[in-house]
Amino acid sequence: MKYCSLLLRNGEHTLKKSGILSSRLDAEILLSSIAGKDRLELISKENLKVSNEQALDFHNLIERRKKREPIAYIIKKKEFFSLPFFINSNSLIPRPETELLVEKILSIYKNKKPFILDVGTGSGCIILSLLDKMPNARGVGLEISKDTIKIAKINAKKVLKNHIFKVKFEHSSIQNFYSKKHFDVIISNPPYIPTYEIKNLSDDVKNFEPKLALDGGKDGLDVIKKVIYKSKYILKSKGILALEIGNGQYFKVSQILKNNFFRTKYLIKDFKNNIRCILSELNF
């Protein structure tokens, strides 16, 4: 048996030596996942022990984190909008900034019955968080990767439980997607990082997260342009297109929206005061 307090100190020391700023927190999360204990319990109970086998498992997880593998991929879990989502390296890790987009959509469509399309659904965190909070909403999650759709379907069962009928996932690109019924809302967190900037991302991101979910082409706008163009044909008149965008892309994206009969209604800034989301109304 090994004392958790000693394992935490050793794990923190190893990660700190590797330059990981969140070394203590990461060690606590990893040991918590191994021990099946709450983080606060690990911290507060000095005499808490785990088996030698669990201690070895913890050491192996620390070694993975030392190589910059994201915590979410190691423990296969990430909280988003207070909901637990299954995550692996086939899907982008949900970000806090994207929660701002979900909050705004909820504020607009509270107590309504929107039909929602989530383009590039990934883990399903956006569409499932919305459907969880809106009893009468229905939605479609669109995803180009078959492996990623599997993740979204797992999360749909966890989040929606007996209401899984509220969502459908389709394997398709936005260009090839067809729907008989028009949508009230189309929402997308597309790949928007310019190809040349990928190499400048942190090791946690560029070495582990799927390039398909990051690389937006030469100017970062390849997928955004496709989403905007297709949306005017499958969105209801006065419907909302909600896009997450990259730093410095607002003016270009707003012009593309204008050229495709969209009028900007809301802008959302992230925690660094950058324009992160554009919500536009279709006037077509």
Located regions from the model:
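Residue-level signal for inorganic ion chemistry
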Residues: 30, 68, 98, 126, ...
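Conserved hydrophobic residues forming the short capping helix/wall of the S-adenosyl-L-methionine
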Residues: 15, 156, 160, 231, ...
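A short N-terminal interaction module
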Residues: 1-58
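Conserved SAM/SAH cofactor-binding pocket of Class I
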Residues: 97-200
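Conserved AdoMet
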Residues: 33-107
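Conserved SAM-binding loop
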Residues: 94, 118, 141, 216, ...
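Conserved Class I SAM-dependent methyltransferase catalytic core
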Residues: 218-281
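Mobile active-site "lid"/loop adjacent to the S-adenosyl-L-methionine
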Residues: 192-223
